[in-house]
């Protein structure tokens, strides 16, 4: 059974519901009981004269569960009222859309609470890490992976993350491992404290220092050198240095260090 509702508007939908005296609206969440399986969908009793229909592609937002294995006869649960099939005169239901709505609601709550999250890694691409949070695909840019080394061996493993940018309308979910690390170590990251770390990157604008699981930056302006050429001659990757914490940016997960302020 398929839908062919081109040009079918919300106003048409409301007229149909009124004609058949359904006390329902497009977008409603309704309770129903599964009573029959068909080839490409499920029949559901939601209290209307004609049974509602749940297409197989609307079973779950999780592609691994987008089949009938998660459903049983006589299961009673909630469904999202998605559409109306003119030919069959059936209301079309969705579990996938309901999961999507509830997932974003939960993500907004996690953002408001600035929660530390334990999230499954789904894979990697050139730009960073792909994750899954509450059934929604998200992304961790390379710049927010900290010292984490990308490798397929970590697929389906869990990593600590914090939300960085959430845009539901564009389905944009950006997270940060760097923020999570800063949050976990925040009690030890006190401005003015001296830390010891290993240089793991030398750039024209400063030194990146590995401090445990964290990565800190000693900007060129915070190094005791007279000219830029000295930075590559004076420092080598793997050198252990001491620096002072001058700023902890918990929002972006940045650790700023200085060698000028060493006593």
Curated annotation (Swiss-Prot):
Keywords, in A-Z order: Chloroplast, Plastid, Repeat, Ribonucleoprotein, Ribosomal protein
Xref: InterPro entries: NA-bd_OB-fold, Ribos_protein_bS1-like, Ribosomal_protein_S1-like, S1_domain
Domain S1 motif: 27-96, 114-178, 192-260
Native source species: Pyropia yezoensis (Susabi-nori)
Membrane-spanning intervals of the chain: none
Location relative to the cell: Plastid, Chloroplast
Pfam families (alphabetical): S1 (PF00575)
Record-linked SUPFAM superfamilies: Nucleic acid-binding proteins
UniProt protein name: Small ribosomal subunit protein bS1c
Gene3D superfamilies: Nucleic acid-binding proteins (2.40.50.140)
GO biological process terms held by the UniProt record: translation
GO cellular component: chloroplast; ribonucleoprotein complex; ribosome
């Amino acid at each position: 059974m398929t839908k062919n509702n081109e040009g079918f508007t919300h106003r048409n939908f409301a007229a149909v519901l009124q004609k058949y005296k359904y006390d329902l609206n497009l977008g409603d969440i309704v309770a129903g009981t599964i009573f029959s399986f068909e080839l490409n969908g499920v029949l559901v009793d939601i209290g209307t004269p004609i049974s509602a229909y749940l297409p197989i592609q609307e079973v779950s937002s999780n592609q691994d569960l987008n089949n009938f294995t998660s459903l049983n006869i006589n299961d009673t649960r909630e469904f999202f009222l998605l559409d109306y099939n003119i030919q069959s005169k059936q209301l079309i239901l969705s579990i996938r859309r309901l999961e999507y709505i509830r997932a974003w609601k939960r993500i907004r709550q996690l953002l408001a609470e600035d929660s530390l999250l334990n999230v499954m890694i789904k894979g990697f691409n050139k730009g960073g890490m792909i994750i899954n949070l509450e059934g929604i695909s998200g992304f961790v840019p390379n710049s927010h992976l900290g010292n984490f080394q990308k490798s397929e061996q970590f697929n389906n493993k869990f990593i600590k993350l914090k939300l960085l940018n959430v845009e539901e309308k564009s389905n944009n979910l950006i997270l940060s491992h760097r923020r999570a690390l800063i949050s976990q170590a925040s009690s030890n990251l006190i401005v003015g404290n001296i830390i010891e770390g290993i240089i793991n990157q030398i750039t024209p604008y400063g030194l990146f220092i590995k401090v445990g699981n964290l990565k800190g930056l000693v900007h060129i302006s915070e190094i005791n050198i007279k000219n830029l050429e000295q930075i590559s001659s004076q420092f080598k990757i793997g050198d252990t240095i001491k620096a002072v914490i001058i700023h902890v940016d918990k929002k972006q997960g940045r650790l700023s260090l200085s060698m000028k302020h060493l006593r």
